[in-house]
Amino acid sequence: ESDLIILVGANPRFEATMLNSRIRKNYIKNKTEIYSFGDIGDLTYPYKVIENNTRIIKDIVDNDHDLSKKIINSSKPLIIVGQSILKIKSGKYIFEELKNFLTSNDKINNEWNSLNVLSNHASTVGSYDLGIFSSEDGRNLTLEKVKNNKCEVIFLFGQDDLKFKKKK
């Protein structure tokens, strides 16, 4: 449905192939404009490269960039933020500024949410839903409980990125 797609630290071809195929289908069918912060290689559809710099986000949210008007004039813009962006020092700033800009321009509402996060692992979203990870600072709350002997039993289903040290 989207008529404008912006990738911020996301590479859907490698991180979410189904999403990438839907973006491609949308491009072929609707000639959707697609932008990416930085050149992320062949996505199987054309996209315009934006300088990979946090300053550009500030320019966009301050209405000092060409993309500002495109987002505002778009009926259903889609901004996809890669999970890796949220881990950098300016990650929270980037996410919050985009969220505030989109909310103030009615691009996040009951009908459409323009701001999306592309998770690195399928299990990550479920981990947030179950309260295993803190969405505020990314801490592994369950692992903290285990270290403090506050859990009797733990089932690990699809925890792709947990690292355990072997005890000798």
Where in this protein do the model-derived segments appear?
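Extended redox/cofactor-interaction regions of prokaryotic respiratory oxidoreductases
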Residues: 1-22, 26, 35-75, 80-168
